[in-house]
């Protein structure tokens, strides 16, 4: 994650987004990878140098593949990488009103903090990308069958973006928020995405209307 964070920040700073999969992109990756490797050596036990070198070579191959695929087949061509390891919170998750005449002030809300690996932004749109080390079939399964059942992370991230005005300081939060898992090993995002506006809405009226199909209601019930 640290290598990708520094790489995308470098490309953003240099006005080199979207990625181009050229010599400049590859040189930037090598600079960032080397800098992170030096930091790693100072902080961690590295074991046998030859084994570390093998791991670094494999990592470089994976990241070069990711850069190439993203440059040539972006998951959302209308959005650009914009925020990296984005901290958020406290995101207020309200409790359901407990009875007739109850108000939001009567409840004890949850306040959730977290870090989103990457956010891509476009006109009125935001895309959450959640980095994963594994292969895509497992994450396609989660998106298809496990959201709001055993997996709350992506819906919470998406809900955060619907109210996070820091992403659009001169305007309103994005009208459309979608989320995908991103396999770093394969350099691809899931084909399936989370784009259910009712699921991620923090509007009390939506929560009441969709009942168990809303992240705020389900997460609070689980607590």
Language-model features: locations:
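Active-site-adjacent bridging/hinge elements
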Residues: 33-39, 125-136, 183, 189, ...
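Short loop/turn segments at secondary-structure transitions that flank enzyme active sites
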Residues: 6, 10, 90, 135, ...
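A non-catalytic, helix-rich entry segment at domain boundaries
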Residues: 2-96, 193-206, 214, 219
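Non-catalytic protein-protein interaction segments used by genome-maintenance enzymes to assemble
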Residues: 83-166
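C-terminal substrate/ligand-recognition segments
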Residues: 6-10, 128-129, 154, 179
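Metal-dependent nuclease catalytic regions and adjoining charged, substrate-binding loops involved
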Residues: 158-223
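Short, polar/flexible loop-turn hinges at active-site or ligand-entry regions and domain interfaces
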Residues: 12-19, 142-143, 166-171
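A residue-level signal for conserved active-site and pocket-lining positions in enzyme catalytic cores
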Residues: 1, 63, 118, 157, ...
């Amino acid at each position: 994650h640290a290598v990708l964070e520094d790489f995308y920040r470098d490309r953003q700073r240099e006005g080199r987004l979207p990625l181009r999969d050229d010599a400049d992109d590859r040189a930037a990756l090598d600079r960032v990878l080397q800098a992170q490797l030096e930091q790693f050596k100072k902080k961690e036990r590295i074991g046998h140098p030859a084994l570390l070198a093998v791991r670094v070579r494999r990592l470089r191959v994976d990241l070069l593949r990711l850069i190439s695929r993203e440059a040539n087949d972006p998951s959302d061509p209308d959005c650009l990488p914009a925020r990296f390891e984005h901290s958020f919170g406290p995101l207020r998750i309200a409790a359901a009103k407990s009875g007739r005449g109850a108000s939001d002030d009567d409840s004890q809300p949850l306040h959730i903090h977290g870090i989103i690996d990457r956010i891509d932004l476009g006109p009125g749109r935001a895309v959450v990308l959640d980095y994963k080390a594994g292969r895509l079939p497992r994450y396609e399964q989660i998106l298809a069958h496990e959201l709001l059942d055993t997996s709350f992370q992506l819906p919470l991230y998406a809900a955060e973006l619907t109210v996070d005005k820091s992403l659009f300081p001169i305007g309103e939060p994005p009208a459309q928020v979608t989320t995908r898992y991103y396999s770093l090993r394969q350099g691809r995002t899931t084909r399936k995405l989370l784009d259910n506006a009712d699921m991620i809405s923090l509007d009390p009226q939506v929560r009441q209307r969709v009942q168990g199909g809303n992240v705020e209601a389900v997460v609070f019930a689980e607590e």
